[in-house]
């Protein structure tokens, strides 16, 4: 500070140097961010999409596929920029903790996602947030930066998230639920096996079956 050397926060640097021209898929929420981010990045790579990612933990990879082993050997991967086949996707664990000692905004405010997955929203980080409303304000700031041609994906019947969206949102929303708890959600899941390794996914009039070995 005394030498007036230019500095920036990690989230701002990431946004300006990596995310600016990517289709950012941000996974936010109080719980489950690391797991959901890993699952989303894995699904994209399994589908042949060379998505970049930043995960808040090193993934445990159980595969013989060398391509997947290399990509998931660390918690971050740059991925490919936009190509003829797909946008340059980047999956990021979007943390609500503050950005730096000089920038008390949540990290995810910098990321400007096109798609946001909001897992849940509860009171957390009592060292920097006085109450749930303060966290909701930060989520509101992120939501307002998601474009109208983007998407918000969130669980149905989550009061704290619904309250946040009522403050202002111009992005289409997909609500998800287990079919037995909310048959009116946009996306529904129905367990076929109780351990979660096999389930059905319903959207509109379409049904797909998922066989998932990472339950």
What do these predicted ranges mean?
Residues 99, 123, 129-137, 150-151, ...:
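Adenine nucleotide phosphate-binding catalytic loops in nucleotide-utilizing enzymes
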Residues 1-154, 160-171:
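Phosphate-binding loop of NTP-binding sites
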